[in-house]
Amino acid sequence: RPQEVSLQKDRNDWQELRPEQKHIFTSNLRYQTLLDSVQGRGPCLAFLPFCSLPELESCILTWDFMESIHSRSYTYIIKNVYSNPADVFDKILTDKYITERAESVTRTYDELINDGQRWLLDGTVQGLSTKELKRKLWRALVNVNILEGVRFYVSFACSFAFGELKLMEGSAKIISLIARDESQHLAVSQHIIKNY
């Protein structure tokens, strides 16, 4: 639970950050919030319909739940650090750099979810073979693996750098807890890919 980490010092640190530091911290937080919001619904919607192993179903449900906690954690940071949290939230989807970075993840999820649901309901999708549907599943899995193993960690490094400077340490602590979870998600996605 993110509430277990105090952000009092972060509120004070925020006031002392230079404008470019505030920009980096905020842009990074917006990116993390958007991608974890996507991940908060992605694994269950995309992968669960194709899962037949009870232990893997439980794993995917847990993964999905953990991602929703991460999204709440970013919300907790934003609400406790910024005097006007709505300004941060409102700009998440209007920042073209953030949405462009997230597009490859959302695109592969959307393709799999849309075609997969039609396939499951109708048993067919016009012009889509079983092989192509499997290819879309594979692409989504690989994309999620890259998200969990590379993209999140690039953004985490930024948060950790603030912590190393003894700035925004509460936020860095919360991010370190999220990073711990993401390493588990990375292991899960790699296991699925290796055994697919």
Where do the language-model regions lie?
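Non-heme di-metal
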Residues: 1-196
